[in-house]
Amino acid sequence: MIRVRKLLVCTFAICLTQVALAQSDVERGRAEFLSSCAVCHGAEATGDGPLRPFLVKAPPDLTMLARRNGGEFPARRVMDMIDGRAAVQIGSHGTREMPVWGKVYAEGAGADDGRAKLHPEWTVRERITRLTQYLARLQVP
């Protein structure tokens, strides 16, 4: 009985840790959004950022991505759009107004920790994944 109780306590502790980690990832995604995206998309991701009047094409309302995609959040497409490296050959924007964040993140990798210097793509993927997870939570039903 004591072994079962210990096992249950350990399992519960692991679950709480995972919830805390997931929450911190969402908060990091939110911080990433506010520092990188809100200037165009707005703090609430509705496309009303302070730079909107100066852009040729208005930024989309990112809270409506799932609704515009038949009710399913298009995570892969969002990640590819944020990354941008597959679609752009030259410069930080290429032919689009949105920055190529994959390139920006790759160039900045290693500034925070040694692991990122060894594997900058990990940092790029983590940042884009956190940002995508945050956007998924903002979706209007």
Language-model features: locations:
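Bacterial N-terminal signal peptides that target proteins for export
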Residues: 1-11
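N-terminal signal peptide c-region/cleavage motif recognized by signal peptidases
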Residues: 17-19
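Periplasmic/extracellular electron-transfer cofactor-ligation site
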Residues: 24-25, 30-57, 68-72, 83-97, ...
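Extracytoplasmic/secreted proteins, especially bacterial periplasmic and envelope-associated proteins
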Residues: 28, 32, 61, 73, ...
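Axial heme c-ligation environment in periplasmic c-type cytochrome domains
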Residues: 53, 59-60, 84-124
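A charged, solvent-exposed segment within the mature domains of Sec-exported extracytoplasmic proteins
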Residues: 121, 130-141
